[in-house]
A protein has these predicted regions:
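Non-transmembrane, interaction-prone segments in cytosolic or luminal domains
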Residues: 3-7, 16, 87, 106-109
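Glycine-rich anion/phosphate-binding loops
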Residues: 1-11, 46
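Active-site capping/gating regions of soluble enzymes
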Residues: 32-137
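Substrate-engagement module of ASCE P-loop NTPases
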Residues: 7-15, 51-56
Length: 137
């Protein structure tokens, strides 16, 4: 976990020195396994917290990055699959607990999900909350 964070921090620093906007990606495998949605949220929060601490330790200008990450979802072999509204809530919770407000953008990976599966949490969140999401969706 920390090795990836250090590599990404060095990459981000080098990009910024040369006037580029780095797209940084923490190493979070959320789709494989039998973990619950709650466990995915907890692990995502922990990894993102460590990730951003390392970026800050390296002096990365957080206002000049894009975070590329996965949504918090239960594992493929979980006893209870994740509902779209729960994925939206869990993902927003993990991000709001760990991503500094200075980060201007988040790009989501599919995490092995289909396009329809990826879109459902976003659509659910926007139907329920309008376009407002604290800047995350």
């Amino acid at each position: 976990m920390e090795n990836n964070a250090h590599l990404m921090a060095r990459y981000a620093s080098a990009c910024q020195v040369h006037g580029l906007v780095p797209i940084v990606e923490p190493d979070i495998d959320v789709i494989n396994g039998s973990h619950s949605l709650d466990k995915a949220t907890q692990v995502s929060t922990q990894i993102l917290s460590v990730f951003f601490k390392v970026l800050q330790d390296y002096g990365v200008y957080l206002e000049g990055i894009v975070l590329k990450t996965s949504m918090a979802v239960a594992g493929k072999k979980a006893s209870q699959p994740s509902l779209p509204q729960d994925v939206a809530k869990a993902t927003l919770l993990a991000l709001s607990r760990s991503v500094p407000p200075a980060v201007p953008g988040v790009a989501f990976l599919s995490g092995g999900q289909t396009e329809a599966q990826v879109r459902k949490p976003f659509h659910h969140h926007q139907r329920r909350n309008g376009l407002s999401s604290g800047g995350l969706f």
